């Protein structure tokens, strides 16, 4: 809403837009359906829409934050956005957590740039306004993901960066020329890390065919006519053959040039246990088996390494927690997980393998050892005899 003040034409937050969205959402609910909205709004406005409008909102708040965490190997801004979302009353279960879509990687950061521009937050060992934080994060994203070191990603007006998830990863890893990529495994590992962040928390998980195939951006000369008007987003919309039906095609039936796929088609990946799709399948199996999508987020605790992120979720059933523990740094981490929600004596096990890893100590913590760009989904169970019968 604040972003629209003083503008001659606007849609996001306009009273007519809000009324129309609420009307559509109400009509869809009456026939047993649900809706989601993808307006880029402040957290406050997302909460307000959730009260009477669309059932779900696209998570434009944490999306640029997790890209920033990967680009800088520092999760401080991501932890700030996650905590602020919870504190302002937006349940992450009501959000659509997405990887790539058809648009740009937004860095408008409306909540900080406009809605709370004068509010003071602790960030990078200083007291900064929301506007200052937005400027800092935007500068980091532009520096790490575009420019001479990553010319395959392009800025899109003042809204964000035209890129694919794979080229966000490539730029974060310092790859300046996509033609020189010879370590697909490292890109795939970081891509899966981002998938784990989005899938291993309450809410809806979304991704695209560009993600599934590991698509790179198109050379800008291949879409010169389309970008002539300034819309650089066409470089991240490469044609791709999801099922491998026509491997010799050079463009789609609509004339969109075919892009380079790092991972291959779905049939190729399903035949390879180490592929992106197979590993994503394992992540989604854990998500479904433990009911993570409908869990309740309790805590985003402080971390022992700036590249770490820990999400604490309460699962259905007494005495069970799920922890999403991620290493956004391209380096090994030997650290600890600590949260007041972790009961001393609780058993910690790996949801993927079932192996027991640790016991929570009296400081509500346990040690973790994480390879670079690695993620874990952990089950924390309190022994039956230790459960409080009055709870």
Regions found by a protein language model. Give the residues of each.
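Active-site-proximal helices and loops of the catalytic beta/alpha 8
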Residues: 2-99, 105-130, 214-246
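Short amphipathic alpha-helical segments and helix-helix/interface helices
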Residues: 21-25, 195, 336
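Loop/helix patches that line or flank the sugar-binding groove of alpha-linked glycan CAZymes
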Residues: 89, 95-100, 105-322, 328-335
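Residue-level recognition of short, solvent-exposed, well-ordered loop/turn junctions
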Residues: 208, 343, 369-371
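Short, loop-centered acidic/histidine patches that primarily coordinate divalent metals
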Residues: 212, 326-329, 351-353, 373, ...
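Beta-strand-rich binding/interaction modules
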Residues: 332-356
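C-terminal beta-strand-rich structural cap/linker in extracellular carbohydrate-active enzymes
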Residues: 359-391
């Amino acid at each position: 809403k604040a972003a629209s003040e003083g503008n001659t034409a606007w849609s996001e937050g306009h009273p007519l837009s809000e009324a129309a969205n609420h009307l559509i959402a109400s009509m869809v609910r009456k026939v047993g359906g649900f809706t989601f909205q993808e307006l880029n709004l402040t957290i406050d406005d997302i909460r307000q829409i959730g009260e009477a409008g669309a059932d779900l909102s696209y998570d434009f708040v944490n999306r640029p934050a997790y890209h920033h965490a990967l680009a800088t190997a520092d999760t401080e801004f991501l932890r700030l956005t996650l905590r602020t979302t919870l504190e302002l009353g937006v349940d992450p279960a009501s959000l659509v957590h997405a990887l790539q879509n058809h648009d740009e990687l937004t860095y408008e950061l409306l909540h900080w740039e406009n809605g709370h521009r004068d509010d003071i937050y602790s960030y990078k060992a200083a007291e900064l306004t929301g506007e200052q934080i937005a400027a800092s994060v935007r500068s980091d994203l532009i520096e790490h993901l575009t420019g001479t070191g990553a010319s395959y990603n392009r800025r899109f007006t003042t809204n964000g960066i035209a890129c694919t998830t794979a080229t966000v990863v490539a730029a974060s890893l310092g790859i300046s020329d996509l033609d020189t990529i010879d370590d697909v495994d490292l890109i795939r590992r970081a891509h899966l890390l981002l998938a784990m962040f989005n899938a291993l928390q309450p809410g809806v998980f979304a991704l695209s065919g560009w993600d599934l195939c590991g698509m790179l951006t198109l050379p800008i000369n291949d879409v010169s006519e389309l970008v002539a008007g300034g819309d650089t987003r066409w470089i991240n919309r490469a044609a791709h053959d999801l099922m491998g039906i026509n491997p010799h095609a050079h463009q789609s039936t609509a004339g969109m040039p075919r892009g380079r796929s790092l991972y291959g088609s779905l049939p190729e990946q399903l035949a390879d246990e180490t592929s992106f799709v197979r590993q994503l399948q394992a992540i989604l199996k854990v998500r479904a088996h433990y009911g993570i999508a409908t869990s309740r987020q309790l805590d985003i605790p402080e971390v022992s390494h700036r590249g770490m992120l820990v999400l604490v979720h309460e699962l259905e059933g007494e005495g069970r927690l799920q922890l999403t523990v991620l290493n956004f740094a391209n380096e090994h981490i030997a650290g600890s997980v600590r949260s007041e929600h972790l009961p001393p004596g609780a058993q910690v096990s790996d949801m993927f393998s079932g192996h027991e890893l640790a016991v929570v100590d009296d400081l509500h913590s346990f040690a973790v050892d994480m390879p670079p760009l690695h993620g874990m989904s952990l089950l924390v169970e309190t022994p039956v005899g230790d459960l409080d019968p009055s709870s």
